[in-house]
């Protein structure tokens, strides 16, 4: 596994590399280029606390695997999201020699996680994830995988929307018992569930509108933005990744 910026600084501190060598390596570490088409920001995690992630939409399978492996080489673990042909990726990745890696393909979320077997993700807290319906689960799973690479445990409860609100209370009780630092709430249709949750808890709620609804797909987004319950942040439609990042950063701050 290659060295990231933190590893280089520790090596310099311990006297393992010279000043000239660390200067050279830092310059080389600004980004990694793959066949002039992909430029990976490999030190994003050091700057922002959030690792570079491969956005799979519009990329072919070979590009996705190469880019993800390059990030793993530098950071130990990497995620690819919005993979359009997840079945093809599942078939193609078997042809690669990846015996030194743990591979997780989430067909529902259309994500790929590759981790070096020698890399251990530092655990930094817990986040709750709720969905209104089963149709919202793919977006919730994308958020869950994002949290996983950030070292955050996801406590999940799916299909607990307001059409059968009695289903919600045991799930919410468990979230409180698990001491989650915030709750991601994924909902389509009219998008009311985040407002209900925010009226019951004293922690941040992150609303994720989904496109799984009748009529105009923007409806749940507008509902969440116009909520009368304070304490809700809202990401864009189907943006499980963005919700996972936001929640992961909250967990990171709480862990300090």
Curated annotation (Swiss-Prot):
It is a multi-pass membrane protein. This is Uncharacterized protein MJ0165. GO terms for molecular function: hydrolase activity. GO terms for cellular component: plasma membrane. Keywords: Cell membrane, Membrane, Transmembrane, Transmembrane helix. Its main location: membrane. It is found in: Cell membrane. The chain crosses the membrane at residues 181-201, 231-251. The keyword Protein transport does not apply. It comes from Methanocaldococcus jannaschii (strain ATCC 43067 / DSM 2661 / JAL-1 / JCM 10045 / NBRC 100440) (Methanococcus jannaschii). NCBIfam families: LarB (NF033503). GO terms for biological process: 'de novo' IMP biosynthetic process.
């Amino acid at each position: 596994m290659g060295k990231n910026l933190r590893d280089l600084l520790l090596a310099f501190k311990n006297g393992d590399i010279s000043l000239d060598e660390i200067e050279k390596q830092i310059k080389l570490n600004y980004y990694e280029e793959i066949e002039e088409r992909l430029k990976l920001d490999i030190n994003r995690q050091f700057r922002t606390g959030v690792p570079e992630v491969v956005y799979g939409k519009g990329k072919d399978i070979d590009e996705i695997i190469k880019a993800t492996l390059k990030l793993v080489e530098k950071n130990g673990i990497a995620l690819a999201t919005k993979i359009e042909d997840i079945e093809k990726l599942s078939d193609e990745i078997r042809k690669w020699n990846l015996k030194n890696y743990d591979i997780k393909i989430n067909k529902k979320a259309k994500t790929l996680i590759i981790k070096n077997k020698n890399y251990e993700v530092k655990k930094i807290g817990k986040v709750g994830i709720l969905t209104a319906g089963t149709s919202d689960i793919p977006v919730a799973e994308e958020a869950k995988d994002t949290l996983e690479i950030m070292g955050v445990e996801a406590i999940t409860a799916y299909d607990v929307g307001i059409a059968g609100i009695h289903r919600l209370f045991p799930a919410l009780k468990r979230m409180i018992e698990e001491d989650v630092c915030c709750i991601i709430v994924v909902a389509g249709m009219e998008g009311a569930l985040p407002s209900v949750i925010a009226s019951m808890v004293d922690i941040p709620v992150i609303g994720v509108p989904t496109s799984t609804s009748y009529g105009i797909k923007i409806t749940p987004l507008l509902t969440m933005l116009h909520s009368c319950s304070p304490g809700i942040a809202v990401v864009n439609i189907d943006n499980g990744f963005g919700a996972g990042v936001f929640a992961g950063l909250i967990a990171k701050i709480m862990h300090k």
